[in-house]
Amino acid sequence: KSSIITNGHYLENIRPFAHSVSQVGISIDSFEDETNIKEGRECNGKTISFENLRQKIAEIRQTNPNIKIKINTVVNEWNYNEILADKLAELNIDKWKILCQKPFGENKGIAPYQFYAFLKNNWYASKKPKSIFIENKEAMFDSYLMISPDGCFFQTDNSGYKYSRPLTEVMVEDALKEIEFDYNKYLDRYRLVKKYE
């Protein structure tokens, strides 16, 4: 099975081979133009509208009716008071992953109350709460296994990026020892949120 993660701007490019893709993950933090521009979610000055996104998803489903649609939302200082659940319900998505913005460098992330305000507001507005998965800051640290273009495992922490030696030079087992990776936290990322209060 293969999956693709995209910001949605060129989603139509997936359609010709959508029949061979099991899941498409789309990064959507807001449907407000101003919010998307502030956080840099734009392409050549243009943001993706809800209607445009709905049309592109419908076209992909025409090619592959069984394809799973996942939305990834990073809660940040510009969108934490927005409600996306009502519009996402119209898209009939299969999974909605809500992530808390991680501190990185000079960016301190968001306060816990901002993250939980977003969760609470969208939980009660959601028509499919069983499709919601959440990741707070602690859950995100060291729980992703990422590879850079030059073949290095890497992680991020408050100070920036940490890299292993390239996989072309060392065995996978040795490279993993050079970064922080928590396999149990990785598994916990896929737990289903059954209740939020």
Predicted segment positions?
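Radical SAM/AdoMet-radical enzyme domain recognition
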Residues: 1-98
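Generic recognition of short, well-ordered alpha-helical interface segments
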Residues: 48, 55, 110-117, 148
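Short acidic, glycine/proline-enriched helix-loop-strand junctions
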Residues: 69, 104-133
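Anionic-ligand binding region
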Residues: 83-91, 98-101, 112-118, 122-123
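Accessory C-terminal segments flanking Radical SAM cores
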Residues: 103-104, 126-197
